[in-house]
C-alpha cells in the first residue's frame, strides 16, 4: 500500500513538473489585426506543442474558415506551420452558432523560450486572418512609451467653431503608424468625402514607407473630411487648403477598443493623436461617444419597419431619436465648437433621410415583397408616394446645411448626393430654406459641372458663363483647372492602344451573349459587366492589373460589357486604360442580359471556359485570388 501511495505521489510530482514547464499567456496583448472576427484567448507553450486558444465572434449562421497554410512567425523571423485544429477542421467551413460566438484551438510546433512576440497569419490571400505582434512578455509590453509627438491637447470648452475659408490650395496629410511592420499594409485608401471633389467619394491610394510613415497632398477648395481605410480600422480626419494635418496612429489601442476580450483592459493611450490643423477639435471629435446617427439599423430591419408606412409615418420613424440626440449633445461636456459640429452632422443626416422618403419607401416594398426585376421596374417607375403639402417644411430646422460650417460635416457630400433624389429638389430647397443662394446651392451646382467634366465632357460656352455665378471665385478656379486636365487626358487617350471596341451586331436578345463570346471561342474568358459610374467597378479594374500582368502569357481574354447608362464619351475615354475587348450594348439588350442571367448589380463577373460554358459567376469583386483561381480552373478543365 505504501508503495502504491509512493508511486501515485511520484506520478503527481512528475505531472506537476511537466505542467510547470508549460508557459501560459492569458489574453496576450497585440499590435494590430486584419479582422476582429477571431481573438486570441490564451497561448499555452510546452516542449512539444504550442496551443493557441481562439474565440471567434462573427455573424450567426455565417461561416469562417482557417487555412491549412496558416502559421506563426516569431520576432526572429522563424516560421511555425499549423499542425491541426481542435474544434475546427482546417480549410473547412465552420458555421457560427446563434450566439455569434465560438471557441476552438490551433496547434503549432513548440516555440523557443527566448521568443517575445508572434504573428499569426493564414497567408497572403484576400481576406486572410492576420494578427501582428502577439505579445508573450506582457510586462515589457506595458512599459513601452509613446513618442513625444503623441500629445493630448487641452480643450478650450468655450471655443467656437471657426468658419472655414474658401481657398483653392493644397491640403497636406501626413502620418505615422506606431509599431508598424511592412507585412501589415503597404498602402492605404483615402476616401475623400467632399463636394468640392466628387459626391461619389473619390479614393486616393497612399503608399506607406518602411518606417510606417505616409504623406498625401490634395487640391481642395475648403475644409474636407477624409477617411483612411486600414485593415485594423477606419480613421477619420479633416484637411484644409494650405494646412497640414498630422496623425500618429496607435494600432494597439485602436484594436484593443474593438476587441471583445480586451476592451476593458488597461489602455495604451489614444487610438489616434492629432497635430496641426484644428488638432484639439479633431482630437475631441475622435473621442465623442454620443451616437448621433438617427437610425443605425440593418437596412432590411429598417425596410421591415417602414414597409407600408405613409410618408408622415416614415418621417416620424427616422426622426424619432432627434430630440433625445439634441438633448444629449446639449448636456455633454464637449466644447461649444464640438457641440455645434455635432448638431450640424445631425442636420445633414436628417436632411438626407427626409430627401430619401420616396426612394426608401419604394425600396422597402420591393425588398420585403421580394419583387423580381420586371416587377421592381414597374413598381419603382409607376408608383407614386404621396407626400402631403408642407411635408418638407421640416428642412427649415436644418438650415445649418446652407452654411460654410457644414463643410466640416463628414456627411456633407453624401447629403448633397441624397438631395438629388428629392423631387423638384431646387424648388423644395428654395422654399424651405427661404433662399436660392448660399454654400449648399454653390456646391450642388459645382457638382453638376465637376461631374460633367470628369465624365470627359469639357466645359461648354454656356457652362463657362455659369462659372461667373458662383459666390466665390475658388469654384471657378478649380473647375477651370480640372477642365484643362481632362482636355489634356482626352488628347492622350487618342494615342493609347491595348483595347478593342466591338459591335454586338444585329442579333436577337436570346443570341446576344452567345454571339458576343463566339468570337473568342477556344479561349478562357473573364467577362466583366460594369458601368462607368460604378465606383467598385473602377476600383476592381485597378485591383486586377497586377493579375493581368502576371497572367499575360496565358490564353485569357478580358471581355467588358456595359450599357447605355455609361455615357458614350465617358466610356470611350475610360476604356483606353482597361485593356481588353469592349462592348457597349443598348438599354434593351442590357436589360435582357440582366434579367436572363439574374444579374443583380455591377460589377458582375463570369468566367467562361474555352468551350463557352460559364464556370463561375459572382456579383461584386471576389478578390484577385479567387478570380485567378477560377480562371485557372476554367483553363485546366
Regions found by a protein language model. Give the residues of each.
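Conserved segment of the thioredoxin-like fold in thiol-based oxidoreductases
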Residues: 549-590, 595, 599-602
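Short, well-ordered beta-strand segments enriched in hydrophobic/aromatic residues
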Residues: 49-58
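A non-transmembrane, solvent-exposed segment enriched in polar/low-complexity residues
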Residues: 86, 133-336
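Conserved helix-turn-beta segment immediately C-terminal to the redox Cys motif
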Residues: 523-524, 541-561, 629, 633-635
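Conserved redox-active cysteine motifs that mediate thiol-disulfide chemistry
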Residues: 529-546
Amino acid at each position: 500500500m505504501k508503495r502504491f501511495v509512493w508511486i501515485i505521489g511520484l506520478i503527481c510530482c512528475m505531472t506537476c513538473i511537466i505542467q510547470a514547464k508549460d508557459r501560459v499567456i492569458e489574453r496576450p496583448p497585440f499590435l494590430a489585426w486584419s479582422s476582429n472576427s477571431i481573438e486570441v484567448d490564451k497561448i499555452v507553450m510546452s516542449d512539444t506543442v504550442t496551443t493557441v486558444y481562439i474565440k471567434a465572434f462573427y455573424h450567426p449562421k455565417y461561416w469562417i474558415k482557417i487555412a491549412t497554410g496558416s502559421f506563426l512567425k516569431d520576432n526572429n523571423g522563424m516560421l511555425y506551420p499549423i499542425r491541426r485544429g481542435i474544434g475546427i477542421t482546417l480549410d473547412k467551413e465552420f458555421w457560427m452558432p446563434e450566439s455569434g460566438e465560438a471557441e476552438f484551438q490551433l496547434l503549432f510546433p513548440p516555440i523557443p523560450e527566448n521568443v517575445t512576440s508572434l504573428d499569426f497569419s493564414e497567408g497572403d490571400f484576400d481576406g486572410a486572418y492576420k494578427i501582428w505582434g502577439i505579445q508573450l512578455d506582457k510586462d515589457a509590453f506595458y512599459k513601452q512609451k509613446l513618442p513625444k509627438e503623441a500629445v493630448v491637447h487641452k480643450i478650450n470648452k468655450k471655443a467656437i467653431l471657426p468658419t472655414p475659408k474658401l481657398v483653392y490650395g493644397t491640403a497636406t496629410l501626413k502620418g505615422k503608424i506606431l509599431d508598424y511592420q511592412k507585412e501589415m499594409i503597404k498602402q492605404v485608401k483615402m476616401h475623400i468625402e467632399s463636394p468640392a471633389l466628387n459626391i461619389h467619394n473619390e479614393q486616393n491610394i497612399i503608399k506607406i514607407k518602411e518606417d510606417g510613415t505616409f504623406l498625401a497632398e490634395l487640391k481642395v477648395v475648403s475644409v474636407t473630411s477624409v477617411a483612411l481605410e486600414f485593415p485594423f480600422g477606419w480613421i477619420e480626419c479633416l484637411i484644409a487648403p494650405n494646412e497640414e494635418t498630422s496623425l500618429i496612429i496607435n494600432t494597439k489601442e485602436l484594436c484593443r477598443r474593438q476587441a471583445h476580450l480586451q476592451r476593458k483592459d488597461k489602455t495604451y493611450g489614444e487610438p489616434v493623436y492629432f497635430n496641426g490643423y484644428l488638432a484639439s477639435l479633431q482630437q475631441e471629435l475622435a473621442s465623442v461617444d454620443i451616437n448621433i446617427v438617427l437610425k443605425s439599423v440593418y437596412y432590411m430591419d429598417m425596410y421591415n419597419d417602414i414597409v407600408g408606412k405613409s410618408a408622415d409615418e416614415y418621417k416620424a420613424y427616422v426622426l424619432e431619436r432627434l430630440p433625445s440626440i439634441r438633448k444629449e449633445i446639449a448636456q455633454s461636456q464637449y466644447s461649444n465648437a464640438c457641440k455645434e459640429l455635432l448638431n450640424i452632422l445631425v442636420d445633414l443626416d436628417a436632411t438626407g433621410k427626409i430627401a430619401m422618403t420616396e426612394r426608401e419607401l419604394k425600396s422597402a416594398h420591393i425588398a420585403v415583397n421580394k419583387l423580381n426585376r420586371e416587377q421592381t421596374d414597374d413598381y419603382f417607375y409607376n408608383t407614386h408616394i404621396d407626400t402631403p403639402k408642407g411635408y418638407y417644411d421640416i428642412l427649415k430646422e436644418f438650415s445649418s446645411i446652407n452654411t460654410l460650417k457644414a463643410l466640416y460635416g463628414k456627411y456633407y457630400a453624401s447629403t448633397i448626393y441624397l438631395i438629388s433624389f428629392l423631387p423638384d429638389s431646387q424648388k423644395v430647397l428654395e422654399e424651405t430654406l427661404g433662399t436660392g443662394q448660399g454654400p449648399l446651392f454653390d456646391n450642388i451646382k459645382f457638382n453638376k459641372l465637376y461631374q460633367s467634366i470628369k465624365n470627359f465632357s469639357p466645359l461648354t460656352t454656356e457652362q463657362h458663363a455659369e462659372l461667373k455665378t458662383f459666390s466665390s471665385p475658388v469654384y471657378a478656379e478649380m473647375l477651370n483647372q480640372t477642365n484643362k486636365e481632362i482636355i489634356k487626358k482626352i488628347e492622350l487617350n487618342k494615342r493609347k492602344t491595348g483595347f478593342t471596341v466591338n459591335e454586338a451586331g444585329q442579333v436577337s436578345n436570346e443570341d446576344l451573349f452567345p454571339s458576343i463570346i463566339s468570337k473568342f471561342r477556344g479561349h478562357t474568358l473573364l467577362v466583366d459587366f460594369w458601368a462607368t459610374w460604378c465606383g467598385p467597378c473602377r476600383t476592381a479594374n485597378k485591383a486586377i492589373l497586377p493579375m493581368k500582368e502576371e497572367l499575360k502569357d496565358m490564353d485569357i481574354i478580358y471581355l467588358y460589357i456595359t450599357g447605355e447608362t455609361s455615357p458614350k464619351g465617358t466610356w470611350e475615354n475610360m476604356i483606353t486604360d482597361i485593356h481588353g475587348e469592349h462592348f457597349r450594348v443598348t438599354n434593351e439588350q442590357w436589360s435582357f442580359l440582366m434579367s436572363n442571367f439574374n444579374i443583380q448589380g455591377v460589377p458582375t463577373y463570369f468566367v467562361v471556359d474555352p468551350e463557352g460554358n460559364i464556370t463561375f459567376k459572382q456579383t461584386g469583386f471576389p478578390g484577385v485570388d479567387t478570380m485567378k483561381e477560377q480562371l485557372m480552373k476554367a483553363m485546366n478543365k
